[in-house]
Amino acid sequence: MSNIIKQIEQEQMKQDVPSFRPGDNVEVKVWVVEGSKKRLQAFEGVVIAIRNRGLHSAFTVRKISNGEGVERVFQTHSPVVDSITVKRRGAVRKAKLYYLRERSGKAARIKERLNAK
């Protein structure tokens, strides 16, 4: 029974997801429905967490908008997510960057990773 579930989940997974890690700046383009119109909305920020669970994988992106921190959790393989673009690679030593929530301004900066693997 579990083989059937795995096969169905494998078919549903996107193949064009780029490789990114916590600390990277990414731009996520999301389909937004407003009334009868559909349009793409971009959300650009720092990846602060990644949850790898196959089809149920998700990642959290944080940005500062008008001086207020905004975090959004995206399902990696969701049809709502149109594209993910890595803008800048960040050099961090932790998997979860929740400490950035308490920091602002220059203290919240992340060094750029030079050797992109």
Swiss-Prot record:
Superkingdom: Bacteria
Alphabetical GO biological process terms: translation
One Pfam family recorded for the sequence: Ribosomal_L19
This protein's UniProt keywords: Ribonucleoprotein, Ribosomal protein
PROSITE patterns recorded: RIBOSOMAL_L19
Gene3D superfamilies (alphabetical): 2.30.30.790
InterPro entries assigned to the protein according to its UniProt record, in alphabetical order: Ribosomal_bL19, Ribosomal_bL19_CS, Ribosomal_bL19_sf, Translation_prot_SH3-like_sf
GO molecular function: structural constituent of ribosome
UniProt GO cellular component terms: cytosolic large ribosomal subunit
Family: Belongs to the bacterial ribosomal protein bL19 family.
Physiological role: This protein is located at the 30S-50S ribosomal subunit interface and may play a role in the structure and function of the aminoacyl-tRNA binding site.
Record-given protein name: Large ribosomal subunit protein bL19
Name of the encoding gene: rplS
